[in-house]
Amino acid sequence: MAEQQRRVQVVVVIGGGPLSGRAARAVRDDAFVIAADSGLDQAVAAGMRPSVLVGDLDSISAAGRMWAYAHEAEIDEYPADKDLTDTELALARALRVPDVWQVLLVGGIEDTGERRLDHQLATILALGHPALAAAHHVRAVIGTTELAMVHPGHHVVLELEERQLFSLLALHGPCTGVTVTGARWPLTDASLTGTEARGVSNEAGERTDVSVATGVLTVVIP
């Protein structure tokens, strides 16, 4: 009998604030955890043990650095002047984990009144990188909002309560062949662009499936 393929969940923890309960619950006990800079502080506070620390390390605490050295985490340090964000570097590192099946990004939202919308948008856009299609599932929980990325060749099953809201957004460019089954408002071979809101506020059914033929579709679950 052939050996069953391992399905590794790789979790990327970013900084910004404490992780929500929804984010923490999405992380499996056997997950491989990668921290992006000060994401290590949030990961440790949530009871995780990061195996890798990635970034320019300009925002991680001194205690976080000491934790990484004491626990012999792999440290991939980059110069502050770089073209990629720490989040992008961490996502790229996630794809190098053997048998990666799901990439899950988790992050909190700092309640300081100085939230960086540009950072949040850049993080969501990074999740749609074509290379991430190598993982079968790409998801995120940012604050208390869940995201799922739908790449061509993969479909996403939304495990939601009936009538729970979800939205479809073409944030990464036009999407064609958008098909949604089991929802209140199904779609068949539809096209969505980033300038229309036709996919906002749909309602899940008993089993809701989402797929796309071309483009990268973002499913938002408030």
Tell where the protein language model's regions lie, with residue ranges.
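Long, charged alpha-helical interface segments
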Residues: 143-145, 150-222
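Conserved phosphate- and dinucleotide-binding cores of soluble alpha/beta proteins
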Residues: 102, 110-162, 181, 189
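Acidic/Gly/His-enriched mid-domain segments of enzyme catalytic cores or analogous surface patches
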Residues: 3-5, 27-30, 34, 38-135
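Short beta-strand segments
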Residues: 13-15, 37, 106-108, 141-142, ...
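N-terminal nucleotide-binding beta1-loop-alpha1 segment
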Residues: 1-18
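Solvent-exposed alpha-helices and their adjacent loops that cap or buttress functional pockets
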Residues: 2-7, 24-28, 45-46, 67-69, ...
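Active-site glycine-rich loop that binds ribose-phosphate moieties when present
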Residues: 19-20, 86-89, 151-152, 193-195
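Short N-terminal binding/cap micro-motifs at the start of the first secondary-structure element
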Residues: 20-23, 42
